[in-house]
Amino acid sequence: MHSRALVGCAIGVSLAPGVPSRAAPPEQVVIRGRAACLDDAGQRRAAGAACDDHPSGGWALEGEGGALHRLSPEDTRVAMLGDVRVRSHELQIVAWRYDDGRLAIVHLYTVIDGKLHDPYYYCPICAIRTHAPGPCWCCGRPLEFHDPPLEGASGPAP
């Protein structure tokens, strides 16, 4: 009897006007462009300015018309942009766009000769595959970089 009353009360509260509901889920987007390192003000660094592994203003994807799509600094896949073997190519990302405009990468692909490639780092000793460059967190050896093509993929990522 008490459980029915609690369920009824919970339903009534969740449907009551003025009670905020959960935030809408983020929008999934597919964006093609080039990696852009940002300065402290969040602006694209001047042409010719060197991008290091961790630019002070973070990373963005520069899409059509020069639009900057800012990438979330908490996103672990953003570390791949510190590798010139990744950022030197056109990129395609599948990402969640949150209400504040930041993007969280779901998939990151390089575009080479019009075909999508799937970059990653691998330790053959420990059989660890990751999207963050650096030493293997198990054995400490350098990770190998791989960028194989996706079979038959040239358009938006699957």
Positions of the model-derived regions?
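Short, charged beta-turn/beta-strand-edge "cap" motif at the junction between a beta-strand
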Residues: 96-101
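Sec/Tat signal peptide C-region and signal peptidase I cleavage site
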Residues: 19-23
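N-terminal export leaders
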Residues: 1-8
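OB-fold (S1/OB) nucleic-acid-binding surfaces
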Residues: 47-71
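Structural detector for short beta-strands of small beta-barrel domains
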Residues: 25-55
